[in-house]
């Protein structure tokens, strides 16, 4: 029986600068991720002659391949097909969608780079439970728009900044599968428990026909946030100790890290990085790579400093540094840090490497750097209480508040907030500074633009660009809370909390220059030379079902 395609293809890494391994032919490169239903050789064959192949590797009874494609032409778009053991499996027979293409952006002077980003996509359709009023899915709507006009302007890369799946908030369809497999009264109940159940989340998210086609033709880069594992993942040392004391947590965290490595992380790597990765080589060489990957996940959980999920991409004269703000945390209250020392050193090196070689610096972090001022001050206040600054009873209150209110962004790690602020200021203030330094984030279920006050003298414009969710719902009371958090009254309340916690005064202030916008939405940066334009599109429901993308905001940044 011929091998079949279970999931994918996903077009992941696309590079117009011949970023393949040293022994690959010249030309642009790409990687395509697939899951097959049995061991096989997966091949990508392009209409212009570019191609690549890879043997599947096995994890927990599943069969995957990451196919390096070489010989692509920068500036060109070529349709491609996927074959398993030389049997065509993509495009699907009778597909209503246009052919999937690999489009390699040009990186020369005058060429534009379009970077779209967002986060927090609950994959269930709007009619399911709590999302009955959530509205159309922004990725579904983008797919419908592009499929209707294949020549329309499209992103050169799609950044998915966390909560690609919700391991702790499963849909009715997934809950039915869980109940058929095990007793839902046993922990973790309706949450996923192991690798197999994680695979169902990705099936649901990426198997959606519109999103499946979109991800087959628009390159993507991804980083996790908390719901990819569990709400409030690594919020504090006491939280982690409590989780490790449960009978189900170890399998959950190992399966979460294993599935992230397979489904998301591998596609962030270039063909050269894949070829040099010892774990990838070990997994591919083994008849069954499960134990090797499980050992890696166990080591990463025990000592996060041994693993790096952060990554860097250079798109011509645009640099993207994506920071892991979940797994690399140092949680000891006396030394809390968003990043361990080695991770922080690596991020700094990537940001400051080769000064003058880029016109735009994009720092992607699932958690916003600049928050509404009230929330920032509340997080700094809570962190001060937890350190014992107001005594033991206030420390208990601070920890309880931190967990109940999700007070775990950069502001909840004051030393790390100051470190990141200093790094961005240094990058923006050099004589050979880029035109813009943009922090791209999600998580907070609304979109906004914020800018530091008093940075007009720097060489670069520094901005916090936040866009969330792609598909989720936010109660009206929470919307009101976010609006209040940006208000003057909210600022005054935040300062009062900071004084109570004896929090040092902030070294700089910031103001909101756009938003807040609420809804299912996607931000896009268009970068051309030293010019930059921002656009926000929101998914709006249309009569008769479905949705359309509506341009809510467009502005020039540089």
Regions found by a protein language model. Name each.
Residues 1-558:
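Metal-dependent phosphoester/phosphodiester hydrolase catalytic core
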């Amino acid at each position: 029986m011929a091998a079949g395609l279970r999931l994918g293809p996903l077009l992941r890494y696309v590079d117009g600068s011949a970023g393949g391994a040293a022994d690959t032919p010249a030309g642009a490169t790409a990687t395509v991720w697939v899951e097959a239903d049995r061991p096989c050789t997966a091949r990508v064959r392009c209409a212009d002659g570019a191609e690549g192949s890879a043997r599947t590797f096995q994890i927990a009874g599943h069969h995957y391949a990451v196919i390096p494609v070489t010989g692509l032409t920068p500036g060109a778009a070529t349709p491609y097909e996927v074959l398993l053991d030389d049997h065509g499996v993509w495009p699907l027979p009778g597909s209503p969608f246009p052919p999937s293409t690999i489009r390699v952006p040009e990186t020369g002077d005058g060429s534009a780079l379009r970077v779209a980003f967002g986060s927090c996509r609950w994959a269930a359709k709007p009619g399911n439970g709590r999302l009955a009023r959530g509205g159309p899915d922004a990725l579904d709507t983008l797919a419908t728009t592009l499929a209707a006009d294949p020549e329309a302007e499209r992103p050169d890369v799609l950044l998915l900044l966390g909560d690609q799946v919700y391991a702790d908030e499963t849909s009715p369809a997934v809950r039915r599968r869980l109940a058929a497999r095990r007793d839902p009264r046993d922990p973790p109940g309706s949450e996923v428990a192991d690798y197999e159940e994680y695979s169902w989340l990705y099936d649901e998210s990426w198997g959606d026909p519109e999103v499946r086609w979109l991800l087959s033709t628009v390159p993507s880069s991804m980083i996790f946030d908390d719901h990819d594992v569990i709400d409030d993942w690594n919020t504090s040392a006491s939280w982690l100790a409590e989780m490790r004391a449960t009978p189900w947590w170890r399998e959950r965290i190992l399966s979460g890290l294993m599935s992230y490595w397979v489904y998301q992380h591998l596609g962030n790597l270039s063909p050269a990085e894949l070829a040099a990765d010892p774990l990838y080589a070990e997994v591919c060489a083994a008849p069954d790579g499960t134990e090797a990957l499980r050992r890696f996940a166990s080591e990463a959980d025990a000592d996060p400093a041994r693993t790096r999920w952060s990554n860097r991409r250079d798109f011509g004269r645009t640099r993207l540094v994506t920071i892991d703000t979940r797994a690399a945390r140092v949680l000891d209250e006396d030394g809390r840090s968003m990043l361990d020392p080695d991770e922080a050193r690596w991020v700094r090196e990537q940001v400051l490497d080769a000064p003058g070689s880029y016109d735009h610096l994009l720092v992607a972090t699932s958690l916003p750097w600049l928050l509404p001022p009230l929330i920032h001050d509340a997080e700094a206040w809570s962190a001060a209480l937890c350190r014992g600054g107001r005594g033991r009873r206030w420390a208990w209150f601070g920890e309880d508040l931190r967990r109940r209110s999700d007070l775990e962004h950069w502001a909840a790690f004051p030393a790390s907030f100051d470190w990141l602020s200093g790094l961005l200021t240094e990058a923006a203030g050099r004589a050979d500074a880029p035109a813009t330094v943009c922090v791209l984030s999600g998580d907070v279920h609304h979109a906004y633009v914020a800018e530091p006050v008093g940075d007009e003298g720097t060489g670069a414009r520094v901005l916090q660009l936040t866009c969330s969710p792609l598909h989720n719902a936010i109660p009206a009371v929470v919307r009101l809370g976010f609006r209040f958090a940006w208000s003057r009254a909210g600022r005054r309340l935040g300062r009062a909390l900071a004084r109570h916690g004896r929090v040092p005064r902030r070294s700089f202030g910031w103001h909101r220059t756009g938003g807040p916008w609420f809804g299912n939405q996607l931000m896009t940066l268009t970068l051309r030379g030293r010019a930059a334009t921002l656009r926000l599109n929101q998914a709006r429901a249309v009569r008769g079902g479905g949705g359309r993308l509506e341009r809510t905001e467009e502005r020039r940044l540089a």
